[in-house]
Amino acid sequence: MSALNLTVRVHPVVLFQVVDAFERRNADSHRVIGTLLGSVDKGVVEVTNCFCVPHKEHDDQVEAELSYALDMYDLNRKVNSNESVVGWWATGNDVTNHSSVIHEYYARECNNPVHLTVDTSLQGGRMGLRAYVCIQLGVPGGKSGCMFTPIPVELTSYEPETFGLKLLQKTVGVSPAHRPKTVPPMLDLAQISEASTKLQSLLDLILKYVDDVIAHKVTPDNAVGRQLLDLIHSVPHMTHEQFTQMFNANVRNLLLVITLSQLIKTQLQLNEKLTFLPAA
């Protein structure tokens, strides 16, 4: 498959690690680079992890601690053998003159490595994210070179990552003086209530869009229409009594799980207190 047909999907933990490495950089370092880890399947490069590689950039050369990069990769393979080198990342918004030199090293480590740039300066109030592949250029018997060509990049996340991001969003907009250091997970019933409220607001938004299309206030979008049709077909057909019975059964199961978890928590707390009691 051609490198130009690749699509890059980046998980949130990768961006957090890039920002953390940028914040911990040396005072004389203007750019931070590192290795991207993940997997490649059917033209999709999924980046699930990364680590920083110490380096120094001079006018005519780049000094990188390659032994450190190999050690970090070997340690990561012991924890997660499914993650392989898929490319490299760098902070900044542009490809520099040293990028081709660094890319040559990663081209020896994997096939069709991708280059990810993360704009940590937050130009425009957003963290710019771009992905590139290096295409070889030249004529037979003449000089050859390479050109970094952009490819599609998007953010993706697993369900636990999505849950963690939602918890982090609760601190957005809070002043640093009142911002909590930790955000405890919500109780199960509170999560159901919040999810139901969000679902209701989304349904109201969909109904408003449909009403506006019927009233010719909004130009219909065929893609949105197909997605709404797929959504309707995904809803199981059942009567009101069947839905009520299913809902009540799920609520009873949830309440039972909450009760048992609270009993276990109380028992553990009691056991901890009894353990530290002085012997009579």
Swiss-Prot record:
Reported function: Component of the eukaryotic translation initiation factor 3 (eIF-3) complex, which is involved in protein synthesis of a specialized repertoire of mRNAs and, together with other initiation factors, stimulates binding of mRNA and methionyl-tRNAi to the 40S ribosome. The eIF-3 complex specifically targets and initiates translation of a subset of mRNAs involved in cell proliferation.
Keywords of the record: Cytoplasm, Initiation factor, Protein biosynthesis
Top-level taxonomic group: Eukaryota
Compartments (UniProt record): Cytoplasm
Predominant location category: cytoplasm
Subunit structure: Component of the eukaryotic translation initiation factor 3 (eIF-3) complex. The eIF-3 complex interacts with pix.
MPN domain sequence ranges: 8-138
InterPro entries associated with the record: eIF3f (IPR027531), EIF3F/CSN6-like_C (IPR024969), JAMM/MPN+_dom (IPR000555), MPN (IPR037518)
Disulfide links within the chain: none
GO molecular function, one term: translation initiation factor activity
Extent of the signal sequence: none
PROSITE patterns linked: MPN (PS50249)
UniProt GO cellular component terms: eukaryotic 43S preinitiation complex; eukaryotic 48S preinitiation complex; eukaryotic translation initiation factor 3 complex, eIF3m
GO BP annotations, alphabetical order: antibacterial innate immune response; defense response to Gram-negative bacterium; formation of cytoplasmic translation initiation complex; positive regulation of Notch signaling pathway; positive regulation of peptidoglycan recognition protein signaling pathway
Protein name, per record: Eukaryotic translation initiation factor 3 subunit F-1
Family indicated by similarity: Belongs to the eIF-3 subunit F family.
Chain segments annotated as transmembrane: none
